[in-house]
Amino acid sequence: MLFNTIEFVIFFISILSIFIIFKNRKFHHYFLLVAGFLFFYWSNNYLITLLIFSILLDFYVGKEIFKAKTITRKKSLLILSLVGNLGLLGFFKYSDFAIAQFNILGNYINLTDSIPFLNLALPIGISFYTFQTISYTVDIYRGQLKPSNSLREFAIFVAFFPQIVAGPILRAKDFLPQLNEKMEKLKISKLRLITLEKTSFRIGVAMMALGFFKKMFFADNIAPMVNDIFAMPVGLESFT
């Protein structure tokens, strides 16, 4: 479900409307989490299990990295995060490429049988949430971030549907504090109630409209020509 489709627009407006009507912050947390999982399930069905795996892996690995006393253990845990996440990404994204190279090699050494392609569908957003969760564990490893104490909040960070299709990749240190931000003037937590500022809302709508315009009138019209060039780069130059 791309962000410039009517399905996404309807889904987004529905979520935003409920978000505005019910102003309890705890409700917002659970609602955003359910919306994110629903978005992934709608797009990928059973492949949502990969998202859940990444969430659980890096949430608990991040905690263990933070508690680790030796650099060796920290590195081992970070490697576990990298292997777990990049292994899944590589399997879905490059398995057929690896099989093709193996079959080519098999032809050179006269192997009679070739390995059939898996033809796996690439799970939506897997590149974004893979590197997003990796950045979380890397920041903890470097001492730039403390691990989240809430699995719910970490899951919201990873499954935040508005950016998972086309990015950008979120950083936990920028996103997680917003879930429990303070009202500076009143010095009270916004955990229970949230208000939607009209100015911020208008700016957000204007920026989204500008993004839709750029996508539909520029990117979508330029893409066919660019794709043709990338499909046959031999003999072409930068000024072609």
Q: PLM features: what roles do these ranges have?
A:
Residues M1-T240:
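Membrane-embedded transmembrane alpha-helical bundles that form the catalytic cores
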